[in-house]
Swiss-Prot record:
Pathway: Amino-acid biosynthesis; L-leucine biosynthesis; L-leucine from 3-methyl-2-oxobutanoate: step 3/4. Its EC number is 1.1.1.85. Keywords: Amino-acid biosynthesis, Branched-chain amino acid biosynthesis, Cytoplasm, Leucine biosynthesis, Magnesium, Manganese, Metal-binding, NAD, Oxidoreductase. NAD(+) binds at residues 76-89, 282-294. Mg(2+) binds at D224, D248, D252. This is 3-isopropylmalate dehydrogenase. Signal peptide: none annotated. The gene is leuB. It comes from Pseudomonas fluorescens (strain ATCC BAA-477 / NRRL B-23932 / Pf-5). The keyword Magnesium applies.
């Protein structure tokens, strides 16, 4: 029986980078007889333009029916002034919540070929391989009540809510421990337990879960210190588990240790490892349509999809090896270019990965 993959290119550079990822996926599909069937739909600003909402009900139904979703990026200045509840980003939040995608895996890996592209000295980041496990459907991004009210003195005051239940914390903690168990057996839980009640519960529950993983070394770190340590000595970390907002911020910080956020894929998984896969970067509307965006994060998201949702290790490894070979050839998009390398565009980079994969 064929497996259904829903393709959601999104906005900005999304369609450009997705076109290259789809080429790689289609080749892998043929080369390894994966049995995938691909279908396409719209999300974000593209969905607003077509349906008037950032995620149409029929698109959500197709996502539920699919075995995995591959997404580009959403958002752009075109939709910045519309009502907040129907902005492109709300479509992304909704599909995550409705599909139960509570576990976000964001690797930060420095390819040896890109050591000079990192913002830190090579000796600080050489060999970097961190996995950030971010809780994705709870916390302040979804908490209620939220809003803006007028105080007695006429001044406006805005407020948000940061709730976490024991079950929400427990399930993401288990993802963190499971990932640490198959990696370096070190897990750092990041919170703000010296200030936030939600973080105090977070730390308590993580400690409880740790009893089931005696082979994994658990440490705790306040988020402000973690942000500093990621720059000071990033290789002390193996797996980091943290809440929605902290994970959002720390994973973007970690991305720049690798040279470019354009290199980093991500996976968002439900309890059964059904997932949505997307690059960590945004829609980059400032370069959309210019053919210069880096498609490698989206291509590597395909690899993550094969690995985590379908357990297709051989095909996943091959795509990652193809990307590494292209970097060995000195091909670079502008965001990772350095002297002595060859600058290429989006399509050229995608074609190079396809050629490398075909020749493996």
């Amino acid at each position: 029986m064929s497996k259904q993959i829903l393709i959601l290119p999104g906005d900005g550079i999304g369609p450009e980078i997705m076109a290259e990822a789809v080429k790689v996926l289609e080749l892998a599909n043929d080369k390894y007889s994966l049995g995938f069937e691909l279908s396409h739909d719209v999300i974000g600003g593209a969905a607003i333009d077509k349906h008037g909402v950032p995620l149409a009900d029929e698109t959500l139904d197709r996502a539920r029916a699919a075995d995995a979703v591959l997404l580009g990026a959403v958002g752009g200045p075109k939709w910045d002034k519309i009502e907040r509840d129907i902005r492109p980003e709300r479509g992304l939040l909704k599909i995550r919540a409705q599909l139960g995608l509570f576990g976000n895996l964001r690797p930060a890996i420095l390819y040896p070929q890109l050591a000079d592209a990192s913002s830190l000295k090579p000796e600080i980041v050489s060999g970097l391989d961190i996995l950030i496990v971010r809780e994705l459907t709870g916390g302040i991004y979804f908490g209620a009540p939220r809003g803006t009210r007028e105080l007695e003195n006429g001044e406006r005051q805005s407020y948000d809510t940061l709730p976490y239940s024991e079950s929400e914390i427990r399930r993401i903690a288990r993802v963190g421990f499971d990932m640490a168990r198959v990696r370096g057996k070190k897990l750092c839980s990041v919170d703000k337990a010296n200030v936030l009640a939600s973080s105090q519960l977070w730390r308590e529950v993580v400690e409880q879960v740790a009893k089931d993983y005696p082979d994994v070394e658990l440490s705790h770190m306040y988020v402000d210190n973690a942000a500093m340590q990621l720059v000071r000595a990033p290789k002390q970390f193996d797996v980091i588990v943290t809440d929605n907002m902290f994970g959002d911020i720390l994973s973007d910080e970690a991305s720049m240790l690798t040279g470019s956020i354009g290199m980093l894929p991500s996976a968002s998984l439900d309890a059964n490892n059904k997932g949505m896969y997307e690059p960590c970067h945004g829609s980059a509307p400032d370069i959309a349509g210019q053919g210069i965006a880096n498609p490698l994060a989206t291509i590597l998201s395909v690899s993550m999809m094969l690995r985590y949702s379908f357990n297709l290790t051989e095909a996943a490894d091959a795509i990652e090896q193809a990307v590494s070979r292209v970097l060995d050839q000195g091909l670079r998009t502008g965001d990772i270019w350095s002297a002595g390398c060859t600058k290429v565009g989006t399509q050229e980079m995608g074609d190079a990965v396809v050629a490398a994969l075909r020749n493996l």
